[in-house]
Amino acid sequence: MATKLVESEIENKLEALNALITDDTPWERSGDSIKKTFTFKSFIRAFGWMSQMAIWAEKLKHHPEWFNVYNKVEVTLTTHDAGGLTELDFSLAEKMEKFK
């Protein structure tokens, strides 16, 4: 089971994650999760990205909560088993940023 991060680790990892963004939309903390809305040029690009991320999520054995409408994908990451944010959440978020 993944270990829940302490507050200082979360702050440092969130800052490092937001240094990777290529758009103007940062990841935001929301309680025991991090969230971001990704915007794409079309539905097919949004869905294609989700398909790629699903493969990475399966490899990490860590799955996002996400919602797609047309060209937008809202992502929420948390580790339910740990009761909060873990390294898995930030690893998956980093993959999402790199493949956007």
From Swiss-Prot:
SUPFAM superfamilies: PCD-like
GO biological process: tetrahydrobiopterin biosynthetic process
Positions of transmembrane segments: none
EC assignment: 4.2.1.96
CDD domains linked to this entry: PCD_DCoH_subfamily_b
Record key words, sorted: Lyase
Molecular functions (GO terms): 4-alpha-hydroxytetrahydrobiopterin dehydratase activity
Highest taxon in the source lineage: Bacteria
UniProt catalytic activity: (4aS,6R)-4a-hydroxy-L-erythro-5,6,7,8-tetrahydrobiopterin = (6R)-L-erythro-6,7-dihydrobiopterin + H2O
NCBIfam families named in the record: PRK00823.1-2 (NF002017), PRK00823.1-3 (NF002018)
Family from the record: Belongs to the pterin-4-alpha-carbinolamine dehydratase family.
Name of this protein: Putative pterin-4-alpha-carbinolamine dehydratase
